[in-house]
């Protein structure tokens, strides 16, 4: 199937609202979370439009997928420095964690050649802890 010229550069109100949602949140978001944030800018925005735009932004390289083991995929701005994630078990939000443990590849031992790694910590975020305190 041939791409329409300029399709990847298409910038609609919906696309702008979805981009703004990621920039304002500054953390990985699920499509439902994107919808909730972007609807403040574009009334009547639907989940199908969010999915279409997420796919287009992935193709453009503006977004990157974050696959959580045993969980749903969330999305974040691409081009960030190497980092890891924290998943809140209470509210299901995902947060970026800066930095990396030095020599983490040594955990694999000598039998394996590590090409890359992803670390996800699970627990309760500060907002949820404050509610239960």
Label the predicted regions.
Residues 30-43:
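DNA-recognition alpha helix
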Residues 17-25, 37:
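Short amphipathic alpha-helical elements of helix-turn-helix/winged-helix folds
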């Amino acid at each position: 199937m041939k791409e329409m010229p300029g399709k990847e550069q298409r910038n609609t109100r919906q696309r702008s609202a979805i981009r703004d949602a990621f920039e304002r949140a500054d953390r990985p978001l699920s499509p439902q979370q994107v919808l909730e944030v972007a609807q403040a800018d574009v009334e009547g925005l639907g989940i199908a439009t969010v999915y279409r735009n997420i796919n287009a932004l992935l193709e453009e390289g503006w977004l990157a997928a974050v696959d959580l083991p045993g969980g749903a995929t969330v999305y974040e701005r691409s081009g960030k420095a190497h980092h890891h994630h924290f998943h809140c078990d209470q509210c299901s939000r995902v947060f970026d964690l800066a930095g990396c443990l030095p020599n983490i590849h040594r955990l694999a031992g000598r039998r394996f050649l590590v090409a890359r790694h992803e670390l996800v910590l699970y627990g309760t975020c500060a907002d949820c802890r404050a509610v239960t305190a």
